[in-house]
């Protein structure tokens, strides 16, 4: 029976659904768990304390304990809220995170969706979360939620452009929009004629990498870009009226998105699953590739969270000035320089 089932030719949409479900279980949940634990342990060490220690060995089951706590809480809906939109908003945000997983390769033959415009798809679906945040802010029927939702929308729109422009330098240098092609371009490339370690784009596209990390920080609405949920000003912004399971979905979405953006940065700038000095077409990477990618993801996540615990919150005017007067001009200059060097060299 098993061989007969394996021999059945599945339709493309069926294959996509199966890969998506596997991606949710095999990638998104572990990524969210790892990033969550890493965040709390890192925050604890920076504050000279131990952090979570009771739930599992060394606090490794802390996320499950948090999930159990939230599932026991009452799921309230404000009386004046738009009930349908209010309930759908967390799922829209989570879908954005989930779709990002599908285009990130973990080995030469390990991918969920391999399309020629993979990076374009990743950037497109990353902006879906704006819709969910606006839905949450508007449907809650609360002034704090609405202000938080509008702040988040303005912030995400402002920083989506630097994010896209930062990636364009990578696309120009790699000569492809395909995520697997970008990894292979780094594995087989050269740094000004020297190919000893390939060409990790963090070296030749360091400006783009820095812009990408700052823009990701703003997309995640984490400090110092946490104006949409500023507790001292608007309680918790668009999350104010959420509790129980729906608050948990936002909670999981935040940390899973941080992990997936870190994996995306690792793929675009650190060579993804590739290890310098080895043959990128070797089947070995189908075995060790996921672990290599996970290690690089943790490295980028450390950088993202380091900013979170180091810098104070920006004002709204400072946030917009940083995007429009600093990051966008820098990203455009990076594209021009990359294009010129691509033609000359």
Task: Report residues per predicted region.
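Selective transmembrane helix interface/packing segments
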Residues: 2-345
């Amino acid at each position: 029976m098993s061989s007969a089932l394996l021999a059945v030719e599945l339709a493309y949409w069926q294959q996509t659904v199966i890969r998506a479900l596997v991606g949710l279980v095999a990638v998104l949940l572990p990524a969210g768990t790892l990033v969550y634990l890493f965040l709390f342990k890192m925050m604890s060490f920076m504050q000279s304390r131990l952090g979570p220690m009771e739930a599992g060995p060394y606090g490794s089951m802390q996320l499950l304990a948090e999930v159990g706590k939230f599932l026991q809480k009452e799921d309230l809906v404000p009386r004046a809220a738009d009930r349908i939109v209010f309930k759908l908003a967390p799922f829209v945000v989570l879908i954005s995170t989930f779709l990002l997983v599908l285009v990130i390769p973990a080995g030469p033959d390990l991918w969920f969706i391999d399309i020629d415009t993979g990076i374009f798809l990743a950037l497109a679906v990353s902006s879906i979360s704006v819709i969910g945040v606006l839905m949450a802010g508007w449907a809650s029927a609360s002034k704090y939620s609405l202000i938080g939702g509008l702040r988040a929308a303005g912030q995400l729109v402002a920083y989506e452009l630097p994010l896209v422009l930062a990636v364009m330098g990578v696309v120009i240098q790699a000569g492809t929009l395909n995520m697997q092609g970008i990894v292979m371009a780094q594995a087989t490339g050269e740094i000004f004629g020297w190919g000893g370690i390939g060409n990790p784009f963090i070296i030749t596209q360091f400006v783009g990498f820095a812009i990408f990390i700052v823009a990701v920080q703003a997309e995640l609405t984490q400090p110092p870009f946490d104006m949409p949920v500023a507790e001292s000003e608007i309680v918790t912004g668009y999350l104010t009226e959420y509790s129980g399971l729906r608050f948990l979905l936002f909670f999981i979405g935040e940390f899973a998105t941080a992990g997936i953006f870190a994996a995306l940065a690792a793929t675009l700038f650190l060579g993804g699953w590739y290890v310098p000095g080895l043959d990128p077409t070797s089947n070995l990477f189908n075995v060790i590739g996921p672990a290599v990618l996970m290690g690089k993801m943790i490295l980028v996540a450390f950088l993202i969270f380091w900013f979170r615990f180091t810098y104070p919150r920006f004002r709204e005017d400072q946030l917009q000035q940083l995007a429009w007067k600093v990051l966008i001009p820098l990203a455009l200059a990076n594209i021009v320089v990359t294009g010129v060097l691509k033609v000359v060299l």
